[in-house]
Amino acid sequence: MKFTNKKKIIIATGGTGGHIFPAYSLAKNFIKNNYAVEIITDERGLKYLDKHNGIKLNLNNSATIFKKNIVNLFLSVFVIFFSYIKSLVILYKANPSVVFGMGGHASFPVCIAAKTLNIPFIIYENNIQIGRSNKYLLPFAFKIFVSYRDLFGIENKHDHKVVVTGNIIREEILNFKKKIIFQRRH
């Protein structure tokens, strides 16, 4: 893709709170800095995010390949493939300058689609052990933002991609802490 929108960011995230809330906090921060932000997530993620106006949400269900049943594994491969195709369409239309993969199986096909379209993607890992989706995406990622320097599961050959950012904390939590501190002093 030649003509990227320098002020647009796509955030791809799995549907659990551990992925969604850092993604939402990151999105709000980018919006404050005049970036257009879109979030791609699955149905679980939409349950958390549907109340948050101002951010364009894209539904893109995916699946995990870590199934014990061969029939479910086979079905998962098809779901992931169709999620990848949908991701290509979303990214082509949005034309972002970068994609953030926040982990979870819903972010995997989006990041692979970004790589296909030559859009750089950054993965974020806030756990001490790299997640499975992020581990498979690591060789293709532009950078990996981590909360802990000594993250388990990242080979030394990827050290040049690692940026220690710490945990992304929701503004509501920071504001709550300020209120508590202020109340205790007075």
Predicted regions and their residues:
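Active-site-proximal region of nucleotide-activated glycan assembly enzymes
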Residues: N5-K8, A36, R44, K115-K179
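Conserved nucleotide-sugar phosphate-binding/catalytic loop shared by glycosyltransferases and other
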Residues: K6-G14, I31-V79, T165-I169
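A short, glycine/small-residue-rich beta-strand->loop->alpha-helix junction that serves as a flexible
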Residues: I11-Y24
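Short glycine-/acidic-enriched loop or helix-start segments at secondary-structure transitions
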Residues: I20-A23, L49-D50, N69, P109-I112, ...
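Short, well-ordered alpha-helices that flank and scaffold nucleotide-derived cofactor binding pockets
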Residues: S25-K28, K32, I112, T116, ...
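An aromatic- and histidine-rich active-site surface loop
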Residues: R44-Y48, P96-L117
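An amphipathic, basic-hydrophobic alpha-helix
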Residues: N69-V98, T116
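Conserved donor-binding/catalytic core segment of Leloir-type glycosyltransferases
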Residues: R185-H186
